[in-house]
């Protein structure tokens, strides 16, 4: 309350704040005059504080059922399972209900298309259509954005001003944030996801946007909800390609015991590594990254410390990723060749969304998911072996001319295959 009073004296007349379930239950937000309240989503969290999910939801709903005054507004998604409760609260307390969704909503989503590192969104509001490029990844980001638009409009901002400003939006620090693209075009994201639902949303979002199962580095915090640990393992097993279990603020718990509880959630132990030291786990994930792959480092996001009992160590996932010297990492010969080749071929392939795991000029030993480059030498012309390369499961062939009786969709033409 003191901070809000200070802000008001500075002439600021609109404030957006997070109403935590702890603060609501402890009546720390009582007395504040909320004009708009947003309900984004509800999932398992804070069960070290609340008795169960029912009590947790009850605490969150205090904002809507007690603190909002008559004729003020609730903003939410009309597709979430908590919507009927919010609708009933709005009716009983005579509140205005503003919604986002694909039908029967204040803002109606018409279409959404994934692009490289952004989304093309079309929506309708007050009988007017808007089409915008949103520089964020994930449908959850779109939902949050649309709810923010309604809240901003309710704060007195003009809708056209709001829409024009969207192109300037940047990811929230540590929230599904692209930190680095490696020479092999693998992308590294960090995210604060530390609950089963948040982790599932992030992994699923990356999988849907880039059409590939991400690799994931994650752990679970000590002295927090223990029930979620094996559940998070199950989520990773469902959506991730490679899984690296590491430490994430063990606090006064045994890090080894936390890792064991995580491991208990896996049905299979395939493609899973336990690497306690977080920086080493991140480095290992980068070393093992595939060309055009995705790595998600989850759990800490924006945080800059790692807590082991009474020790608080400086540790930032973002800093670790940025400071890794790719040239000094000891890649396997296979991976290093892929990095060099994909760095050269990136400009050629980026427009076609081509996925591959290696490059070869030998049609006889080419492997599945490789690209074959048809090079003309003194004695042989690689174009004569394109058919053989495709028969041996090459994904695509790079050529400088069309080949008879070969599907053109399997050919990537360039002027000179050697260059």
Roles of regions detected by a PLM:
Residues 1-4:
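P-loop NTPase switch/communication element
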Residues 8-19, 25-29, 34-188, 263-273, ...:
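Acidic, Mg2+-coordinating active-site environments of NTP-dependent enzymes
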């Amino acid at each position: 309350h003191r901070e809000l009073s200070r802000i008001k004296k500075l002439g600021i007349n609109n404030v957006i704040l997070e109403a935590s379930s702890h603060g609501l239950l402890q009546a720390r937000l009582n007395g504040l005059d909320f004009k708009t309240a947003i309900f984004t989503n509800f999932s398992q969290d804070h069960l070290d504080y609340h008795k169960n999910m029912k009590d947790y939801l009850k605490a969150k709903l205090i904002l809507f059922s007690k603190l909002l005054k008559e004729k003020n507004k609730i903003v939410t998604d009309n597709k979430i399972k908590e919507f009927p409760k919010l609708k009933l609260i709005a009716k009983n307390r005579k509140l205005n209900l503003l919604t986002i969704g694909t039908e029967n909503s204040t803002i109606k989503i018409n279409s959404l298309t994934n692009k490289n590192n952004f989304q093309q969104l079309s929506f309708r509001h007050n009988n007017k259509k808007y089409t915008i490029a949103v520089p964020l990844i994930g449908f959850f980001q779109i939902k949050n954005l649309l709810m923010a638009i309604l809240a901003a409009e309710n704060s007195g901002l003009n809708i056209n001003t709001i829409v024009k400003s969207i192109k300037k939006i940047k990811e929230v620090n540590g929230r599904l944030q692209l930190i680095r693209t490696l020479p092999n075009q693998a992308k590294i994201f960090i995210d604060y996801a530390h609950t089963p639902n948040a982790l599932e949303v992030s992994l699923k979002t990356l999988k849907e946007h880039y059409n590939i199962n991400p690799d994931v580095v994650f752990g679970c915090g000590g002295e927090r909800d223990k029930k979620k640990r094996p559940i998070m393992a199950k989520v990773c097993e469902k959506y991730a390609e490679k899984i690296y279990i590491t430490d994430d603020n063990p606090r006064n718990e045994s890090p080894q015991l936390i890792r064991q509880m995580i491991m208990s959630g896996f049905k299979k132990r395939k493609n899973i590594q336990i690497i306690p030291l977080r920086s080493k786990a991140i480095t290992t994930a980068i070393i093992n990254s595939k060309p055009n792959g995705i790595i998600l480092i989850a759990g800490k996001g924006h945080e800059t410390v790692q807590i082991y009992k009474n020790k608080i160590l400086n540790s930032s996932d973002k800093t670790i990723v940025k400071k890794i010297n790719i040239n000094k990492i000891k890649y396997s010969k296979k991976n290093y060749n892929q990095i060099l080749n994909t760095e050269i071929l990136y400009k050629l392939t980026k427009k076609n969304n081509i996925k591959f795991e290696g490059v070869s000029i030998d049609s006889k030993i080419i492997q599945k998911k490789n690209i074959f480059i048809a090079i003309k030498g003194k004695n042989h012309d690689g174009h004569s072996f394109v058919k053989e390369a495709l028969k041996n499961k090459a994904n695509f062939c790079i050529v400088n001319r069309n080949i008879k009786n070969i599907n053109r969709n399997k050919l990537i033409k360039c002027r000179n295959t050697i260059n």
